[in-house]
A protein has these predicted regions:
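Redox-cofactor-proximal catalytic regions of oxidoreductases
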Residues: 48-116
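Flavin (primarily FAD) cofactor-binding/catalytic cores of flavoenzymes
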Residues: 2-63, 116-256, 260-522
């Protein structure tokens, strides 16, 4: 139900309509439906700037129909939702496999060929599923829940398509959220409780505002307007370039988005024929590690094992030892994908032996660094990247990105300037008509989000020590009746939860469940 008149009053306003919002709302409605006591109807408004509610970019139309989960279903899906989700996959199998066959192209054909035998055997835990399936499942379950809670007169859910830009704390212990509609007009809603569920901060820009209107194609965010749209734009661009050697793509970053882009490119025959080279530059020069069976079950991280025998050590010693042992493992041909669980269990054990202050220091200072060291990805994604390397279509470049500037000889192409692994400042010899930013998200103290900046400026939210999330109480409050869910909880450290990132579906589900229980009990 739309709600577009100014300053409408609600009990709860959820700012953001992606997966953090939908999972929290689903838990909240389930709790309301399970109550055995009468209560007044709760009014809830959900505000989302994109024209798609409940899925966010990972599980919605901004991703590809061929975008896969980065880990297997067994690791990805929330444990409490697993039986229901697998039942849904089974019951709707003909529909979604038909959809893949009709709209998924070569990538879907290969995915079905590789995974259908496991689907028939019900071996779901081992499959890297198309992500849109989880988005469709959550959407369906939430729509059913909304209908039920409305029918019982327990809650009424309103939707507004607009961008939240500011939040004002009123004298009567309520909040006024200022919203910018698509037409540029500003409206407001008032609510007693606010749930901030806006997802991750904006992507960190690599394009200088002073660069002006360069002739090359610069894609600031791989998922805006959508990853398939951007691949189509590159294909059209390449078709107009007669010189094969100039049909190059520069990707800045080597994260999961980079890997997904490579996977999709590998299965797009049209653009593959046109493509000369993809250069992916990053500090590490590495993509996330391939998830493999435990190939080295008896491998010993000797320095970490020795550290375990010490009575006292610091968070810095722990991080240094992790990096030292990982370097030794790599030198022996053992990668994190082969020994992930041994390493993780050992690090958790050593982390728990630290005192409270040192544990918090590890979370704040080294948590994200450790996460980047142990990044993993599924076989389909890593194999596609390896195939591109073998076909001499992909080079992984280790170095520090400096800038992309328009070529002096032909502004329709970008030129990469970088510092090499040997500390030399270099210009890459290739020209790039397409540049894709996969460098990650902004830190909060240098954020371009109007809402985030206003929350900090007014003192409603305080940036935590990781610079990736907000300080919250054990009730997830950044301020009185102002709750945070999703990625902006990154760095949370209290007696209930200790996460240095809250980006995967399992963690978001857990937080949403806990917050819903808090709200219902209030």
């Amino acid at each position: 139900m739309p709600a577009n008149s100014p300053k409408q009053q609600f009990d709860i306003a959820i700012l953001g309509g992606g997966i953090s919002s939908s999972l929290t709302l689903l838990h909240l409605i389930r709790n309301l439906l399970s109550l055995n006591r009468p209560q007044k109807e709760i009014s809830i408004v959900v505000v989302e700037k994109q024209n798609e509610f409940w899925k966010g970019f990972p599980y919605g139309k901004r991703s590809s129909i061929n975008s896969l989960t980065i880990t297997t279903l067994g690791e990805f899906v929330p444990e409490k939702e697993k039986k229901s989700f697998i039942g849904w996959l089974d019951s709707t199998q003909d529909k979604w496999i038909g959809l893949l066959k009709t709209h998924g192209g070569d990538a879907s054909v290969k995915w079905i060929e590789n995974n259908y035998p496991m689907i028939q055997k019900k071996q779901w835990d081992e499959i890297y599923i198309p992500r849109f399936l989880f988005g469709d499942y959550v959407d369906e379950k939430l729509q059913e829940a909304i209908q039920n809670v409305r029918a019982k007169g327990l809650a009424n859910i309103h939707l507004i398509e607009a961008e939240a830009t500011n939040l004002l704390k009123k004298d009567n212990a309520q909040y006024e959220a200022e919203l910018k509609e698509k037409n540029g007009e500003t409206i407001s809603v008032v609510a007693g409780k606010i749930i901030l569920a806006i997802g991750s901060p904006p992507v960190k820009s690599i394009q200088s505002p002073l660069s002006g209107n360069s002739g090359y194609l610069y894609i600031e965010d791989a998922y805006l307007p959508g990853i398939e749209n951007n691949i189509d734009s590159i294909a059209q661009l390449f078709s107009a370039i007669t010189d094969q050697n100039k049909r190059n793509i520069l990707i800045v970053g080597s994260n999961a988005s980079t890997l997904e882009f490579l996977y999709l490119i590998q299965h797009e025959s049209e653009i593959k024929k046109l493509l000369n080279k993809i250069i992916a530059i990053s500090y590490s020069g590495l993509l996330p590690h391939r998830i493999t069976p435990n190939n080295f079950p008896n491998y010993q991280f000797s320095n970490l094992i020795s550290l375990r025998e010490k009575k006292n050590y610091t968070s810095t010693e722990l991080m240094d030892t992790i990096e030292k042992d990982m370097q030794i493992a790599y030198a022996k041909g053992v990668h994190i994908g082969d020994t992930y669980y041994q390493l993780s269990d050992l690090v958790v054990e050593l982390l728990n032996k630290l005192d409270e202050n040192q544990q918090k220091d590890f979370h704040s200072t080294y948590g994200w660094r450790f996460t980047k060291l142990i990044r993993r990805a599924g076989a389909e994604y890593r194999d596609a990247a390896e195939e591109l390397i073998q076909q001499k279509k992909l080079d992984l470049l280790k170095g520090k990105f400096l800038s992309v500037v328009a070529s002096k000889n032909d502004p329709a192409f970008g030129v990469l300037n970088y510092i090499s692994s040997t500390s030399q400042e270099l210009t890459h010899p290739l020209l790039f008509p397409a540049v894709i930013n996969c460098s990650g998200f902004e830190e909060l103290n240098a954020c371009s989000s109007e809402l985030i900046n206003n929350l900090v400026k007014q003192g409603l939210c305080t940036i935590n020590s990781t610079n990736r999330g907000f300080e919250v109480s054990e009730k997830f409050e950044a301020n009185d009746n102002l709750y945070i869910v999703g990625p902006l909880l990154g760095g949370i450290f209290n007696n209930k939860l200790r996460y240095w990132h809250v980006e995967n579906a399992r963690r978001i589900y857990t937080v949403g469940e806990m917050l819903a229980e808090i709200l219902v009990n209030q």
